[in-house]
């Protein structure tokens, strides 16, 4: 019987890669790969994510194949986890050989999920936002918001941010982490204030209880909307009129 080895990338290895190459550089590189994948979208064998919803959160499986390899990602989303000392999101992924069904690659994907989410946002903004976009409003300043900011700067050159969160401590953490990297950050006291001069509005929230983060009246013509928190029932973020 043929010997078989499954390659494995753990949390430490993923962190070393990010530290070596930098979040912005990684996201910019991901955008190139994602653009090629979206061009081949119709050729992938795929189904919508399989989700299990509970009062605590959601656990999802995301399978796809190109008939050469098959892969899936496991990811959860539990908004109340930080209060209990856990991460909101954890993830891992498996790649297999379609020819023999053997797994060939297993990877920790919690950090990779954060990078990929930001890369998709940056890729879409690259093609749909106005080319002269220079200011972004960020509604919700949890951990993903920092990846969003770094990705938008790497791909679009945006460094002026107006941010709002219902938790002042989250805003302060965002500023503490990103201002030393050269971002110009205005801590707004309301959503209205944050979006007033925005070319791009990113909503980046996790709590199902806040179903309407952004109202139609707050969106000016020509603004690009990047709503990434509305990923399951009850998390719409945008008013229906939008």
For each predicted feature, which ranges?
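Glycine-rich Rossmann-fold phosphate-binding loop(s) that bind the pyrophosphate
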Residues: 141-142
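NAD(P)-binding Rossmann-fold cofactor-contacting core
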Residues: 155-179
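Rossmann-fold NAD(P) dinucleotide-binding segment
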Residues: 197, 208-224
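Short glycine-/small-residue-rich Rossmann-like dinucleotide-binding loops
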Residues: 205-207, 229-230
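Short acidic low-complexity segments
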Residues: 183-198, 214
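Rossmann-fold NAD(P)-binding glycine/threonine-rich loop
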Residues: 218-219, 228-242
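N-terminal ligand-binding/catalytic initiation module
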Residues: 1-114, 122, 132
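Short helix-loop-beta connector
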Residues: 128-135, 157, 220-221
